Amino acid sequence: GLSRSWGHQVVVENRPGVPGMMAGKEALPDGYTLTFGTSGTLAVNPAVYSKLTYDTQRDFAMIHGGGVIPMVIVASATSPFQSLKDLVDAARKEPGKYNIGYGGVNNTQHLTGELFKSYAKVDLVGVTYKGSAAAVTDLLGGQVSLLVDSLAATMPHIKSGKIRPLAISTLQRVPQMPDLPTVAETFPGFEGVGWAGLVAPKGTPQAVIDKISEDTRKVLSDPKMRDMIMDRGMVADMRGAREWGEFVNAEVVKWAEAARKANLKAD
């Protein structure tokens, strides 16, 4: 999309995690080298790692959101829980009886689950997995009562009827599942989502940031692009530089507090 807008090729270098963020941090602040930052690299890692070699707020300028990745609280199709209310009522009645799996360790899924426990004031035993596949397998096998994972990871199993969605973690309902209530409808203000977007090295001229932000918005406004994003279990993020920057800063603070409350540390 941006290649067409700019009339020249955009070269993508895959450098996941910390190496990618360091390369982005050390690039010239001229707008020619951008980084696709995520909730993991920009907000969750700073919350759980004490010795990162970059600082989200000090080293990067936010350009534009790309996509929001909803998380879903699900139960197996044979679970007695038909709704989020059923789950909360049962968990409050018998604290510590039920467990909740996370499709990852010290990641957005993990922190979203811990944030939910805090909002709902429930005692659920957290069980971490190395990835979504193992977590879903244990949910279907009855080893865990519940699971927090991305919409993308759970949607095929929801459509097949093997697992039952109880609530979604976005502030508003999502087009992929318009009948699925949000957690926020029961616990106002709750939001626990993954996300990704463009960032530049700090010091990039504001005029350059504004131009790239405007061009990114045009790309995301294309119905075909939005459909492609939706098909991947995400929602297009139309927030520009200022609004997305405010959101990311708030996420850094929110996840740091959630990790502190849950005593989560990766190092």
Give the predicted meaning of each segment:
Residues 119-120, 159, 206-267:
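An extracytoplasmic/periplasmic, membrane-proximal ligand-sensing/linker region
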Residues 1-58, 97, 121-150, 157, ...:
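N-terminal (or domain-start) structured segment
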